[in-house]
From Swiss-Prot:
Protein name: 2-C-methyl-D-erythritol 2,4-cyclodiphosphate synthase
Swiss-Prot/TrEMBL cofactor(s): a divalent metal cation
GO biological process assignments: isopentenyl diphosphate biosynthetic process, methylerythritol 4-phosphate pathway; terpenoid biosynthetic process
CDD domains: MECDP_synthase
Family: Belongs to the IspF family.
Binding site for a divalent metal cation: D8, H10, H42
Tree of life domain: Bacteria
Site keyed Transition state stabilizer: positions: H34, T133
Keyword annotations of the record: Isoprene biosynthesis, Lyase, Metal-binding
MF-aspect GO terms: 2-C-methyl-D-erythritol 2,4-cyclodiphosphate synthase activity; metal ion binding
Cofactor, free-text remark: Binds 1 divalent metal cation per subunit.
Protein backbone atom coordinates (compact mmCIF):
# COMPACT_ATOMS: atom_id res chain seq x y z
CA UNK A 1 0.00 0.00 0.00
CA UNK A 2 1.08 3.54 -0.75
CA UNK A 3 0.10 6.86 0.81
CA UNK A 4 -0.03 10.33 -0.72
CA UNK A 5 -0.60 13.85 0.54
CA UNK A 6 -2.26 16.77 -1.24
CA UNK A 7 -2.94 20.45 -0.63
CA UNK A 8 -4.83 23.09 -2.57
CA UNK A 9 -6.03 26.64 -2.06
CA UNK A 10 -8.20 28.98 -4.12
CA UNK A 11 -9.28 32.58 -3.72
CA UNK A 12 -12.93 33.39 -2.91
CA UNK A 13 -14.56 35.69 -5.49
CA UNK A 14 -18.09 36.92 -6.19
CA UNK A 15 -20.03 35.51 -9.12
CA UNK A 16 -18.81 31.91 -8.93
CA UNK A 17 -20.51 28.87 -7.44
CA UNK A 18 -18.88 27.35 -4.36
CA UNK A 19 -18.17 23.67 -4.99
CA UNK A 20 -16.56 21.55 -2.27
CA UNK A 21 -16.25 17.78 -2.36
CA UNK A 22 -18.33 17.68 -5.53
CA UNK A 23 -21.27 19.44 -3.88
CA UNK A 24 -22.45 22.97 -4.67
CA UNK A 25 -22.88 24.90 -1.43
CA UNK A 26 -25.01 28.06 -1.20
CA UNK A 27 -22.67 31.04 -0.85
CA UNK A 28 -22.35 34.62 -2.06
CA UNK A 29 -18.82 33.83 -3.24
CA UNK A 30 -17.20 30.87 -4.92
CA UNK A 31 -13.67 29.73 -5.61
CA UNK A 32 -11.69 31.22 -8.47
CA UNK A 33 -9.98 28.79 -10.81
CA UNK A 34 -9.67 27.34 -14.30
CA UNK A 35 -11.98 24.43 -13.44
CA UNK A 36 -14.74 24.51 -10.80
CA UNK A 37 -11.89 25.14 -8.30
CA UNK A 38 -13.04 22.44 -5.85
CA UNK A 39 -10.14 22.62 -3.39
CA UNK A 40 -11.21 19.44 -1.57
CA UNK A 41 -11.14 17.33 -4.73
CA UNK A 42 -7.98 19.02 -6.02
CA UNK A 43 -6.15 18.16 -2.80
CA UNK A 44 -7.51 14.60 -3.01
CA UNK A 45 -6.38 14.20 -6.63
CA UNK A 46 -2.88 15.39 -5.73
CA UNK A 47 -2.79 12.89 -2.86
CA UNK A 48 -3.86 10.02 -5.13
CA UNK A 49 -1.45 10.99 -7.90
CA UNK A 50 1.36 11.47 -5.40
CA UNK A 51 0.81 8.05 -3.86
CA UNK A 52 1.21 6.45 -7.29
CA UNK A 53 4.17 8.64 -8.24
CA UNK A 54 2.18 10.18 -11.09
CA UNK A 55 2.88 13.86 -10.49
CA UNK A 56 0.13 16.33 -9.71
CA UNK A 57 -3.09 17.68 -11.17
CA UNK A 58 -1.29 20.61 -12.81
CA UNK A 59 0.68 18.08 -14.87
CA UNK A 60 -2.39 16.14 -15.97
CA UNK A 61 -4.90 19.01 -16.21
CA UNK A 62 -2.84 22.16 -16.83
CA UNK A 63 -4.67 25.45 -16.20
CA UNK A 64 -3.26 26.70 -19.52
CA UNK A 65 -5.20 24.02 -21.45
CA UNK A 66 -8.63 25.26 -22.56
CA UNK A 67 -9.88 21.66 -22.51
CA UNK A 68 -10.12 21.87 -18.71
CA UNK A 69 -11.80 25.30 -18.52
CA UNK A 70 -14.82 25.02 -16.24
CA UNK A 71 -14.20 21.30 -15.72
CA UNK A 72 -16.20 19.47 -13.06
CA UNK A 73 -13.64 18.19 -10.55
CA UNK A 74 -15.61 14.95 -10.06
CA UNK A 75 -14.92 14.25 -13.76
CA UNK A 76 -11.24 15.02 -13.22
CA UNK A 77 -11.23 12.70 -10.20
CA UNK A 78 -12.68 9.93 -12.41
CA UNK A 79 -9.77 10.44 -14.79
CA UNK A 80 -7.30 10.24 -11.91
CA UNK A 81 -8.87 6.97 -10.72
CA UNK A 82 -8.48 5.72 -14.30
CA UNK A 83 -4.80 6.69 -14.31
CA UNK A 84 -4.34 4.77 -11.06
CA UNK A 85 -6.05 1.72 -12.56
CA UNK A 86 -3.73 1.86 -15.59
CA UNK A 87 -0.82 1.63 -13.15
CA UNK A 88 -2.43 -1.26 -11.25
CA UNK A 89 -3.69 0.72 -8.25
CA UNK A 90 -7.05 1.35 -6.59
CA UNK A 91 -8.05 3.83 -3.90
CA UNK A 92 -8.55 2.38 -0.41
CA UNK A 93 -9.53 5.41 1.64
CA UNK A 94 -8.99 9.14 1.99
CA UNK A 95 -9.10 11.83 4.65
CA UNK A 96 -9.78 15.44 3.64
CA UNK A 97 -9.67 18.56 5.81
CA UNK A 98 -11.27 21.75 4.49
CA UNK A 99 -10.05 24.98 6.09
CA UNK A 100 -12.59 27.82 5.87
CA UNK A 101 -14.14 30.40 8.15
CA UNK A 102 -17.45 29.96 6.36
CA UNK A 103 -19.69 28.53 5.14
CA UNK A 104 -20.09 25.70 7.60
CA UNK A 105 -19.97 22.51 5.53
CA UNK A 106 -21.28 20.01 8.09
CA UNK A 107 -24.73 19.62 6.48
CA UNK A 108 -23.10 18.83 3.11
CA UNK A 109 -20.54 16.26 4.27
CA UNK A 110 -22.77 13.17 3.80
CA UNK A 111 -23.41 14.10 0.14
CA UNK A 112 -19.68 14.77 -0.37
CA UNK A 113 -18.78 11.36 1.06
CA UNK A 114 -21.34 9.65 -1.19
CA UNK A 115 -20.17 11.38 -4.36
CA UNK A 116 -16.47 10.94 -3.70
CA UNK A 117 -16.91 7.32 -2.61
CA UNK A 118 -18.85 6.54 -5.79
CA UNK A 119 -16.04 7.90 -7.96
CA UNK A 120 -13.29 6.22 -5.94
CA UNK A 121 -15.16 2.91 -5.87
CA UNK A 122 -15.16 2.78 -2.06
CA UNK A 123 -17.86 2.91 0.58
CA UNK A 124 -18.66 6.41 1.85
CA UNK A 125 -17.33 5.44 5.29
CA UNK A 126 -13.88 5.19 3.65
CA UNK A 127 -14.11 8.90 2.78
CA UNK A 128 -13.45 11.17 5.75
CA UNK A 129 -14.20 14.87 5.39
CA UNK A 130 -13.57 17.29 8.21
CA UNK A 131 -13.69 21.06 8.45
CA UNK A 132 -11.89 23.56 10.61
CA UNK A 133 -11.37 27.31 10.68
CA UNK A 134 -8.13 29.23 10.74
CA UNK A 135 -9.22 31.09 13.90
CA UNK A 136 -9.52 34.31 11.86
CA UNK A 137 -5.79 34.26 11.02
CA UNK A 138 -4.16 34.52 7.60
CA UNK A 139 -5.89 34.59 4.21
CA UNK A 140 -8.39 31.92 5.27
CA UNK A 141 -9.14 33.79 8.48
CA UNK A 142 -9.75 36.97 6.50
CA UNK A 143 -12.11 34.96 4.27
CA UNK A 144 -10.00 35.61 1.18
CA UNK A 145 -9.83 31.92 0.27
CA UNK A 146 -10.40 28.31 1.23
CA UNK A 147 -7.73 25.62 1.62
CA UNK A 148 -7.87 21.84 1.79
CA UNK A 149 -5.51 19.04 2.78
CA UNK A 150 -5.90 15.39 1.84
CA UNK A 151 -4.27 12.07 2.56
CA UNK A 152 -5.05 9.04 0.41
CA UNK A 153 -4.17 5.37 0.64
CA UNK A 154 -3.94 3.27 -2.51
CA UNK A 155 -3.28 -0.43 -3.00
CA UNK A 156 -2.37 -2.73 -5.85
CA UNK A 157 -5.26 -4.36 -7.65
Amino acid sequence: MLIGFGYDVHRLVPGRPLVLGGVEIPSKRGLEGHSDADVALHALMDALLGAAGLGDIGTHFPPTDPAWAGANSLDLLRRVVGLLAEEGYRPVNCDITVVAERPKIGPYVPAMRERIGAVLGVEPRRVSIKATTNEQMGFVGREEGIAAYAVALIAGR
